[in-house]
Amino acid sequence: KEKAAALNLSPQEVSVLASIVKGEALHKDEMPDIAGLYLNRLSKGILLQADPTVIFANNDFTIRRVLFKHLTIDNPYNTYKYKGLPPGPIMMPSITSIDAVLNYNKHDYIYMCAKDDFSGYHNFAKTVAEHQINARKFQAALDARNIKK
């Protein structure tokens, strides 16, 4: 409770954020960095823009490539459209993801994009320009593998 309060989050909000971190991370060692990124976005009042929340909002867990049409859904779980945390968890958070939120890595990252090697890791960025470079590489890798949906 004390660690949650230090983050200006309730225990429920920690669970919600931990569920997003779990949905985003394929590797446990990356969870504290992802948690730190989302906490940075929350503290700056920036939309979370978390793809796992969009997949949840669309109720389509077959989505491998989030497209613009997915981002337009009017659903409070769509963190591309609604600021702050969604109203509830998008999945059951793990102890590891809860721990990652409560013991997040402090850094200045605001953006992340999956690596184009499909390792399950992310490239992190501090600026839009850095992020756009990473995103273009990943989009090209998706295109090369003919991943359209």
Regions found by a protein language model. Name each.
Residues 1-149:
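Bacterial extracytoplasmic/cell-wall-associated proteins, especially those involved in peptidoglycan
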